[in-house]
């Protein structure tokens, strides 16, 4: 029986994780949940999974949740302290880190320091603090399993092989909803256009990142730290069918790939049960029903966000942290109708141009740079810092 703390339980990954838990009550128990503001869904999750502890964003939400729960319920905490308490819950064997954005960094770091194994769905943890986090993982002797479908595919394709035999990692990308759109049309993209992903069902922020291809950029940076491999050995191929989730090419010319229907339950379950596997309810892949699998090189001129991620890795040190912070601000501005879709990458690049990369030695320093990046991007976009 593996005991889980799920950070971000009401988001897309959190909901899928709990679907797997519900399907295998003999294998998993939920001891802690954290959520943002979706109290109705959180209440249902509490009633179904009976966690000992839950944490929400602020005190007002905590009080409201307390009123919604009739009878004896879990301990209800709030804020960063509450998230950390959930991430370090004494009974938890594994923490599913699925909080969206840089907000997931502090509780994930706390979980590692508390000796918890991590199922990592939060890209930004490694993007903003990759070196620090991987050093912590080694120092505390914990396991970190990727939940991203692409990194899970790479992880699976590396099993039984030596890293020194790897020629390159090939991350696949669907290309998003605008893969075939001409450059001049991208400035006219609406929020509803961008939220209509052709293959995957995801949360709003990651769906916009997928449309801009910044999502793939974040994954390139994440892969660099997860697999301790230089950026020049990480390639990206556009694969519109999203059947091959990523590949590893070896020095002898062999390529290992992981295939499957696009459904996040599969990589989540693998992270929860590694090295074993469990039934997930994912639709079987019928190869005979496929009309074909196609691959293309990314067009950096139409999707400059991906190129910015490679630049951030090349600049190194604190630059990925700034890039990520600016992206979160710019995506929020687009979702709120303040800027055009094409202005997302422009805002990120301008913010990066203002930054002088420097070494980050602590999580606190990462948070300071993250704040600087957000404020600079807001300033450049003319958004009130508050």
Curated annotation (Swiss-Prot):
GO MF annotation: an example: 1-deoxy-D-xylulose-5-phosphate reductoisomerase activity
Role according to the record: Catalyzes the NADPH-dependent rearrangement and reduction of 1-deoxy-D-xylulose-5-phosphate (DXP) to 2-C-methyl-D-erythritol 4-phosphate (MEP).
UniProt: 1-deoxy-D-xylulose 5-phosphate binding residues: 123, 149-150, 174, 197, 210, 215-216, 219
Residues given in the record as NADPH binding sites: 10-13, 36, 38, 122, 124, 203
Gene Ontology biological-process entries: isopentenyl diphosphate biosynthetic process, methylerythritol 4-phosphate pathway involved in terpenoid biosynthetic process
Entry EC no(s): 1.1.1.267
Binding site for Mn(2+): 148, 150, 219
Keyword Oxidoreductase annotated: yes
InterPro entries in the cross-refs: DXP_reductoisomerase (IPR003821), DXP_reductoisomerase_C (IPR013644), DXP_reductoisomerase_N (IPR013512), DXPR_C (IPR026877), DXPR_C_sf (IPR036169), NAD(P)-bd_dom_sf (IPR036291)
Top-tier EC class: oxidoreductase
Protein name (database record): 1-deoxy-D-xylulose 5-phosphate reductoisomerase
NCBIfam families tied to this protein: Dxr, PRK12464.1
Pathway: Isoprenoid biosynthesis; isopentenyl diphosphate biosynthesis via DXP pathway; isopentenyl diphosphate from 1-deoxy-D-xylulose 5-phosphate: step 1/6
Reaction(s) catalysed by this chain's protein: 2-C-methyl-D-erythritol 4-phosphate + NADP(+) = 1-deoxy-D-xylulose 5-phosphate + NADPH + H(+)
Organism: Geotalea uraniireducens (strain Rf4)
């Amino acid at each position: 029986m593996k005991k889980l703390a799920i950070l971000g339980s009401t988001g897309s990954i959190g909901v899928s994780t709990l679907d797997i838990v519900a399907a295998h009550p003999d294998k998993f128990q939920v001891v802690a949940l954290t959520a943002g503001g979706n109290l109705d869904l959180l209440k249902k999750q509490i009633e179904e999974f009976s966690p000992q502890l839950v944490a929400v964003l602020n005190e007002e939400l905590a009080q409201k949740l307390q009123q919604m729960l009739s009878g004896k319920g879990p301990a209800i905490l709030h804020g960063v302290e509450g998230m950390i308490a959930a991430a370090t819950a004494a009974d938890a064997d594994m923490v599913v880190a699925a909080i969206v954005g840089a907000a997931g960094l502090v509780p994930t770091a706390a979980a590692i320091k508390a000796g918890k194994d991590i199922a990592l769905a939060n890209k930004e943890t490694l993007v903003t603090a990759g070196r620090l986090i991987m050093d912590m993982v080694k120092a505390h002797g914990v396991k970190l399993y990727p939940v991203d479908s692409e990194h899970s595919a790479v992880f699976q394709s590396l099993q039984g092989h030596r890293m020194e035999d790897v020629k390159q990692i090939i991350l696949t990308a669907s290309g998003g909803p605008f893969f075939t759109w001409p450059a001049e049309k991208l400035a006219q993209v609406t929020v509803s256009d961008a939220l209509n992903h052709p293959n995957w069902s995801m949360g709003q922020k990651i769906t916009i990142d997928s449309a801009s291809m910044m999502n793939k950029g974040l994954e390139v940076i994440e892969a660099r730290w997860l697999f301790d491999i230089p950026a020049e050995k990480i390639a990206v191929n556009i694969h519109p069918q999203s059947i091959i989730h990523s590949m590893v090419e070896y020095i002898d010319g062999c390529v290992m790939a992981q295939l499957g229907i696009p459904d996040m339950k599969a990589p989540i379950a693998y992270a929860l049960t590694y090295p074993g596997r469990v039934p997930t309810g994912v639709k079987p892949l019928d190869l005979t029903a496929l009309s074909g699998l196609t691959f293309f090189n990314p067009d950096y001129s139409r999707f400059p966000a991906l190129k910015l991620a490679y630049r951030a890795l090349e600049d190194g040190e604190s630059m990925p942290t700034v890039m990520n912070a600016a992206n979160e601000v710019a995506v929020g501005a687009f979702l709120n109708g303040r800027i055009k879709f094409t202005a997302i990458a422009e805002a990120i690049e301008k913010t990066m141009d203002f930054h002088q990369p420097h070494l980050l030695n602590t999580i606190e320093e990462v948070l300071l740079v993250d704040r600087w990046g957000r404020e600079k991007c807001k300033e450049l976009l003319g958004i009130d810092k508050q």
